[in-house]
Amino acid sequence: MEDFVRQCFNPMIVELAEKAMKEYGEDPKIETNKFAAICTHLEVCFMYSDFHFIDERGESTIVESSDPNALLKHRFEIIEGRDRTMAWTVVNSICNTTGVEKPKFLPDLYDYKENRFIEIGVTRREVHTYYLEKANKIKSEKTHIHIFSFTGEEMATKADYTLDEESRARIKTRLYTIRQEMASRGLWDSFVNPKEAKRQLKKDLKSQELCAGLPTKVSHLISPALKTLEPMWMDSNRTAVLRASFLKCQKK
């Protein structure tokens, strides 16, 4: 799983995930499923905010290429991925500037158009179940919740999905691709079932102990890259941007 994560996610995302885990005393090399989950969540948060701006009239607009003459402001403030101290500093600054209620838990994003914090969820289970868990934890109607699943389902507070359909479809496609790539490597079942993953980890560690004294041979050959899926609703410009933003997965 660790190899998969490092091959299939942008190095910046991998680095942020490693820092987040180490901040809580967790090891990405051991808790590989959590490593994959954090990288996935980070990527969804970044994709959520991609291309979305507010123009000089205060209207939301989608811009795929930078125009130096345009007076644009990022629609979303990304809070997820920052260390806790900096994240709370950003949250406090937003609250002081906008007057919105300070959340009890760190949210993932702030939407300057709707003036609300957003909690993003990515689940391997039923979206309804995960949504209720998030809502019960946050216990605030001020924070907007948006849940995505690896099966293409989604659920949001009051069925308000914030983004346009194409932007959400882009996120769903990426999640589906991650699922398919995990499945092709035999990683999906253990990712969905953490208990099975722990059992496999113990088995692997035991095997490493038994083989510790044996000579090893490492292959440095690089396998062909797998082409990124290009769904029919993506035009060539958007696809080019995505190709530049995300690394291609490699087959084993």
Curated annotation (Swiss-Prot):
Cited Gene3D superfamilies: Influenza RNA-dependent RNA polymerase subunit PA, endonuclease domain
Q: Which GO terms describe its biological process?
A: viral RNA genome replication; viral translational frameshifting
Does the keyword field hold Ribosomal protein? no
Q: Which Gene Ontology molecular-function terms are recorded?
A: RNA binding
Q: Does the keyword Repeat apply?
A: no
Q: In chain numbering, where does the site feature Important for efficient shutoff activity fall?
A: 202-203, 206
Q: Which InterPro entries match?
A: PA/PA-X, PA/PA-X_sf
Q: Where is this site: Important for efficient shutoff activity and nuclear localization?
A: 195, 198-199
Q: Which UniProt keywords apply?
A: Decay of host mRNAs by virus, Eukaryotic host gene expression shutoff by virus, Host cytoplasm, Host gene expression shutoff by virus, Host mRNA suppression by virus, Host nucleus, Host-virus interaction
Q: Which domain of life is it from?
A: Viruses
Residues annotated as the enzyme's active site? 80, 108
User: Where is the protein situated, by its record's location annotation?
Assistant: Host cytoplasm; Host nucleus
Sorted alphabetically, which Pfam families does this protein's record hold?
Flu_PA
Q: What does this protein do?
A: Plays a major role in the shutoff of the host protein expression by cleaving mRNAs probably via an endonuclease activity. This host shutoff allows the virus to escape from the host antiviral response. Hijacks host RNA splicing machinery to selectively target host RNAs containing introns for destruction. This may explain the preferential degradation of RNAs that have undergone co- or post-transcriptional processing.
Comment text on domains: The probable endonuclease active site in the N-terminus and the basic amino acid cluster in the C-terminus are important for the shutoff activity. The C-terminus acts as a nuclear localization signal. The C-terminus is recruited to host protein complexes involved in nuclear Pol II RNA processing.
Q: Family assignment?
A: Belongs to the influenza viruses PA-X family.
The name this protein carries in UniProt is Protein PA-X
What organism is listed for this UniProt entry? Influenza A virus (strain A/Silky Chicken/Hong Kong/SF189/2001 H5N1 genotype A)
UniProt lists the gene as PA
